[in-house]
């Protein structure tokens, strides 16, 4: 196991939407490296289906103040309202910027970017559902990821693919770089850097049934927590109402935005009882609680009464084919159901972390409850908590979040690097991590030590005690 040293001005950890957008902003102004444990286009941003909200008003009257109102209300009024205003105000230019970079948005007949309804988004502060979500069929995240990655490639951004960052170097309260493990060789790589942005995504794999990929293990928050940085809003975890039964694979809100209906075992459109005005397009927390309530009251479907149905059969084959192609392919592949003819079994699935690394609106990491800035360290996207989502995120605001605050993280890196001088880390900067890895490898031979068992026990405990309704303390 070798220790290899690199020197950069800035490092971005993670190559999903937030990391790539930060790289686009920072790369022209510094020597920059993007370190990712996956190939960039395999990042989880690509799994996002439904859309990215912005008050473009292409279909009907809209403005960013209404978007902001909905976001704050949907958060149970626990979001940071100045940050929400920034998110919603900058959304419009962010969508236009992506369009100019080549993102193939779906279009209206007049050529403008198409927009559709999404849960919790309304016009005139709750009067009716809003057509606000800009989309590319039902593969919006995939298109955003591809567009941002191609922009990075065209700019000559340096990538270190399949490197897992395991540690950050902070000396005297100042960032000095990161240490990573090269997955292919087992070598340790030390990256000197004055500025580091964590854009490592969420941590949904703490749950057994999750929409998250296996790679979403909370790397960024975990690394900083071990350095004494307190995490924010960790109790707020979103459960998406419509995951494929038992699998957790997400069926986007786009399906309900196009007219899909949730039904219980009796075929009743039960959301009419829980949200009479917006029904199936209520915010995700409300819909997930409604489904959980239906199941607990014996109205769930199936032999165990533990799921409900998402009914698309009334939409027609042409609408399903044109607007929901990926969603319906998932259903055909994984549950062998033809959604044109049969309703789909769904259940709430662990989906999105509202909490994470505390930051200000410029993506600067805060090291304590007083808002003290940790010099040179930034975070954006799901790994960060700014907090624009409060206790519940509205659908389509996550893709918006990564672009708006990814850009701000890149700008902050540029400002910081331009005002500081280069330095050198000690020659043995990676030795402590090397020793930890060797000790871990030796421990693997202990029959009483099993990483898979620890993970399974964690997932079982979270699944039982920390889902939609939490009635007891967790004991691990």
Show the residue positions of the predicted features.
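A glycine-rich dinucleotide-binding beta-alpha-beta segment and adjacent secondary-structure elements
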Residues: 166-175, 180-181, 323-384
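Glycine-rich active-site loop/strand segments that organize a redox cofactor
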Residues: 54-87
């Amino acid at each position: 196991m070798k220790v290899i040293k690199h020197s950069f001005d800035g490092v971005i950890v993670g190559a999903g939407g937030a990391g790539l957008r930060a790289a686009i902003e920072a790369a022209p102004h510094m020597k920059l490296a993007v370190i990712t444990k996956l190939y960039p286009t395999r990042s989880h941003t690509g799994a996002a289906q439904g859309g990215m909200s912005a008050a473009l008003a292409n279909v009907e009257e809209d403005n960013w103040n209404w978007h902001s109102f909905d976001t704050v209300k949907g958060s149970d009024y626990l979001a940071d309202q100045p940050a929400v205003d920034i998110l919603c105000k900058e959304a419009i230019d962010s969508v236009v910027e992506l369009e100019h970079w080549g993102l193939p948005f779906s279009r209206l007949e007049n050529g403008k970017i198409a927009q559709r309804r999404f849960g919790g988004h309304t016009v005139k502060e709750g009067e009716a559902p809003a057509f606000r979500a800009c989309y590319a069929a039902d593969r919006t995240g995939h298109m955003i990821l591809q567009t941002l990655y191609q922009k990075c490639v065209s700019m000559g951004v340096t990538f270190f693919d399949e490197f897992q960052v395991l540690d950050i170097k902070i000396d005297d309260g100042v960032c000095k770089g990161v240490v990573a493990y090269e997955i292919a060789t087992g070598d340790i790589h030390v990256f000197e850097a004055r500025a580091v942005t964590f854009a490592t995504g969420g941590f949904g794999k703490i749950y057994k049934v999750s929409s998250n990929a296996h790679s979403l293990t909370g790397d960024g928050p975990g690394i900083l927590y071990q350095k004494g940085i307190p995490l924010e809003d960790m109790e707020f975890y979103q459960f998406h109402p419509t995951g494929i039964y038992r699998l957790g694979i997400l069926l986007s809100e786009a399906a309900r935005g196009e007219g899909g209906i949730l039904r219980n075992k009796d075929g009743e459109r039960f959301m009419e009882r829980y949200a009479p005005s917006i029904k199936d397009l209520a915010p995700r927390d409300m819909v997930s609680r409604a489904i959980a309530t239906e199941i607990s009251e014996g109205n769930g479907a199936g032999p165990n009464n533990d799921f409900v149905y998402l009914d698309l059969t009334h939409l027609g084959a042409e609408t399903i084919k044109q607007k929901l192609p990926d969603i319906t392919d998932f259903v055909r592949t994984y549950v062998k159901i033809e959604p044109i003819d049969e309703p789909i079994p769904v259940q709430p699935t662990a989906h999105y972390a509202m909490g994470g690394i505390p930051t200000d609106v410029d993506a600067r990491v805060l090291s304590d409850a007083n808002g003290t800035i940790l010099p040179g360290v930034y975070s954006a996207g799901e790994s960060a908590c700014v907090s624009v989502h409060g206790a519940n995120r509205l659908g389509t605001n996550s893709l918006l979040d990564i672009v708006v605050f990814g850009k701000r993280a890149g700008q902050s890196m540029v400002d910081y690097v331009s005002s500081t001088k280069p330095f050198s880390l000690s020659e043995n900067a990676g030795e402590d991590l090397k020793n930890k890895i060797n000790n871990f490898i030796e421990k693997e031979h202990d029959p009483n030590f099993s990483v898979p068992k620890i993970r399974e026990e964690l997932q079982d405990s979270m699944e039982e005690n920390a889902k939609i309704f939490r009635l007891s303390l967790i004991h691990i």
